[in-house]
């Protein structure tokens, strides 16, 4: 009986990461979902530059250089005050750092022709090309868009219908994610626009400290949206794409420990534990190699770094 219980727990610990990274995208790929209309009429827009570091001078110039008719531009650290004082029908939020594509504003507002759409998320990319993990996340967002339930947004570019803009509580760490979850909870559709692009000026792998900071923001959101865990509007995406990922570090740790305990019940469990150990050691040993082999192991290293950043992230969410 003990072996059966441990084996079930071991299986569940491996299944949950498999579900969130493999089965969940497969379910999203099923041929169903919503179709959204696009319009050619350009609504009034207020561009709000409120994320990242900078005085706003360069970004204001690049935004106004898009030539969007009647554009209002606001530079402010206070997102609530900026939104409240804006006159645009559509509020477009931007950061200071990324480069804005000249057609981004025109493209991102097209989907607001469909009255179901309350928020549109733009695409952040790099002119040097994005990594495999980021391409995977972008693909998942595109599939989520079919259901009007894109989970999260890039601070570099997203837009919200003014009458759907919620108030952001103080000390929220991940404002774009909070807004996407809150708007979905309120009944609005959140969709993805791959033609509304921003470009990273610097490419590179985020530091572990940055990943921990991001994880802290997600843990905070976990406490802000408890109702989204229980079969509410958007729960399928919120749990499948986000919540299960936040616990992958725990799943992998539990799988290793349950496997270790199962070694007392037969050689097959010893082999499985050895395979786990070889996998982790190989990731750290071979991810520094150049070429295709090293590239594959760097993807796994990135996966482990992102997953285990949620452990220390639990303890800094309110700092």
Where does each model-flagged region fall?
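N-terminal membrane-anchoring/stem segments of glycan-assembly enzymes
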Residues: 1-39
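Membrane-embedded multi-pass helical conduit in multi-pass membrane proteins
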Residues: 3, 39, 245-319
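Short, acidic, metal-binding catalytic loop of nucleotide-sugar glycosyltransferases
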Residues: 61-70
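Short, conserved alpha-helix that lines the donor NDP-sugar binding/gating region
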Residues: 79-84, 180-181
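Short aromatic/hydrophobic "clamp" motif used to bind/position activated sugar donors
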Residues: 91
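Long helical/loop segments within the catalytic core of UDP-sugar-dependent glycosyltransferases
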Residues: 102-167, 171-172
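Catalytic donor/gating beta->alpha subdomain of glycosyltransferases that bind UDP-sugars
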Residues: 112-115, 121, 125-136, 175, ...
